[in-house]
């Protein structure tokens, strides 16, 4: 009888395609892509990338994938590279294309799962560079529960716009959206808009502020799914090539140690990610995406967890869209490890969580020994921007299933205003351009939820235009859709239940009074219950926008934003 061993099998799946007489044809196919007799005993590692030439966010991934493959080879594995899709939110914003953004997250996760399962690959390095590809890759890792390492493409460098008054201004993509609103109100010349347009994207990399991509890259590092320190360096920085090679080596080592994604993606790891997002004042999309990743990891995570962590973790980072700095500044002062060490020292992080290094969070940080916060980009705990986190979870009569607001940068906790109701975003944009939205209004944009939109479009075009028009602190916008990571101002999203499901937002009318209390975490429609019941009598939801194709399928499958808008 053969002696049993606890040594993990380095080929737990790929033996299905390499071993035995019956796999002669499969081996013949694999020989054609470079495998030989010496490779059959090597673990096969999928190197999945969302590289494309549509958006600068992903341009570095082809180069980084090669580095990952080099690392896999060096560690004794055999890499197998394949691609998946990616949608540019910056290009698809403000028109029909944005309906297809969030669904791309599901397509990415599904496509990676499909290839990994069909080809029986043993582990994966997952590379992504923009908003939906990051959570899509992490969802795939959680769903597959194999040895997996995530690698971010890196952020873009800020551009410098030379304006007509002779000044120079550091700009990112969000400045372009805000310039549109300013120009429409006569507050900026077309020449300055053109100067900003030409400067915002000086090269490759994801949008440079603490927008969704950088927020999710920071969250991935906090989760333990990417190498420590790998989130912050810019896309053009050659340190990324080193991280790529080490990521390839790390996944083979995870196989040797029998560590899979769900060993890392525990409830405590998600609390770490939430804490880092709160401290950075990151994108509200992180709520949606972390809920979805947790769902795939079979971890029970709810909006209450975000609220609980947010109440005890202070907002420490002065970063865009509401602050002064970008991700390259975070990198300059030591990267995400600076924030993590600050939180760990305060008892606000779980130091015993396992990571892709095979070490714990605390061990990684002790090895790196990051510097203390610089006091400008990241403040000390005793000098926070705000004593609670940069995202607030809301509930109340207008959002009984929950809602989300980026409270980072709020000047006042309470806003009470008069409803201006619009079915879908375009009508609201028209009203703003006509000058009929004024201070004190609550702009309600409904039928933009995951199912009703469909696709839960980001509202950056309208929010940036409101800010550019000088109304950012005087107009509250709320929607069952969502917002870009670049959104600032009085913006409440993810209102649940959504309008198409008969949530209270469906029954708001022009002239209703609405009250937001950020400190109390409440969002209320100040209308008598009896009146709301009368409004429901003859209500019918808007008909589906799409009856064929991917969004028709998505409409039938997608769940509420309050549980991550997952498709099960």
Swiss-Prot record:
Gene Ontology biological process terms from the UniProt entry: isoleucine biosynthetic process; L-valine biosynthetic process
Modified residue annotations for N6-carboxylysine: 132
Biased composition annotated in UniProt, kind: Basic and acidic residues: 10-22
Keywords assigned by UniProt, alphabetized: 2Fe-2S, Amino-acid biosynthesis, Branched-chain amino acid biosynthesis, Iron, Iron-sulfur, Lyase, Magnesium, Metal-binding
Cofactor: record remark: Binds 1 [2Fe-2S] cluster per subunit. This cluster acts as a Lewis acid cofactor.
EC number, as in UniProt: 4.2.1.9
Catalytic residues as annotated in Swiss-Prot or TrEMBL: 484
InterPro entries in the cross-refs: DHAD_IlvD/Edd, Dihydro-acid_dehy_C, DihydroxyA_deHydtase, DiOHA_6PGluconate_deHydtase_CS, ILV_EDD_C, ILV_EDD_N, IlvD/EDD_N
Residues that, per the record, bind [2Fe-2S] cluster: 57, 130, 207
Pfam family, one: ILV_EDD_C
Chain residues that bind Mg(2+): 89, 131-132, 458
GO MF entries: 2 iron, 2 sulfur cluster binding; dihydroxy-acid dehydratase activity; magnesium ion binding
Region of interest (Disordered), residue spans: 1-22
Cofactor (UniProt): [2Fe-2S] cluster; Mg(2+)
Reactions mediated catalytically: (2R)-2,3-dihydroxy-3-methylbutanoate = 3-methyl-2-oxobutanoate + H2O; (2R,3R)-2,3-dihydroxy-3-methylpentanoate = (S)-3-methyl-2-oxopentanoate + H2O
Pathway: Amino-acid biosynthesis; L-isoleucine biosynthesis; L-isoleucine from 2-oxobutanoate: step 3/4; Amino-acid biosynthesis; L-valine biosynthesis; L-valine from pyruvate: step 3/4
Enzyme class: lyase
Family: Belongs to the IlvD/Edd family.
Quaternary structure and partners: Homodimer.
General function of this protein: Functions in the biosynthesis of branched-chain amino acids. Catalyzes the dehydration of (2R,3R)-2,3-dihydroxy-3-methylpentanoate (2,3-dihydroxy-3-methylvalerate) into 2-oxo-3-methylpentanoate (2-oxo-3-methylvalerate) and of (2R)-2,3-dihydroxy-3-methylbutanoate (2,3-dihydroxyisovalerate) into 2-oxo-3-methylbutanoate (2-oxoisovalerate), the penultimate precursor to L-isoleucine and L-valine, respectively.
Protein's name according to its UniProt entry: Dihydroxy-acid dehydratase 1
Organism for this UniProt entry: Nocardia farcinica (strain IFM 10152)
Gene (UniProt): ilvD1
